[in-house]
Amino acid sequence: MDTRQAAQRWADVWERGWTEHDAAAITALYAEGALWQQHPFRDPEPGYLARVFAEEESSRCQFGTPIVDGDLAAVPWTAQTRLTDGGTQDLAGVSLVRFGPDGLVVEERDFCHEA
């Protein structure tokens, strides 16, 4: 699969999947054994999506156009979430995503800031 197509598919599925809390659709984008580091300077967290989606009442997000070089894409995104404890969270970030030849994610490193 072409990296540009894979990256756009990744962004589209994440945007819909985050809004709908569809962890299955999102995890289907990743190759078995893929590295996904959700926060810099922290170890990857198994079960991250399930934990985060359980803490969110609703979310709205937007993913930008991927910037692609070889098998790597950088994708900017923003999200506004309403948490189950009544709080809100506004995030702005970029995901650096490396794709395998089959178009599945083999490595992802996320960087974000809470506004």
Regions found by a protein language model. Name each.
Residues M1-D2, L49-A115:
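A beta-strand edge to alpha-helix "cap/lid" segment located at domain peripheries
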Residues M1-E32:
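Short, low-complexity N-terminal intrinsically disordered segments enriched in polar/charged residues
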Residues A6-R9, P44, S58, L72:
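Charged catalytic carboxylate motif
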Residues W10, W14, W18, W36, ...:
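Tryptophan-centered motif/residue detector
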Residues W10-V13, Y48, V52:
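A ubiquitous structural signal for well-ordered alpha-helices
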Residues A24, W36, S58-S59:
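A general structural signal for well-ordered secondary-structure junctions
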Residues L29-P44:
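A short gly/proline-enriched turn/hairpin at secondary-structure junctions
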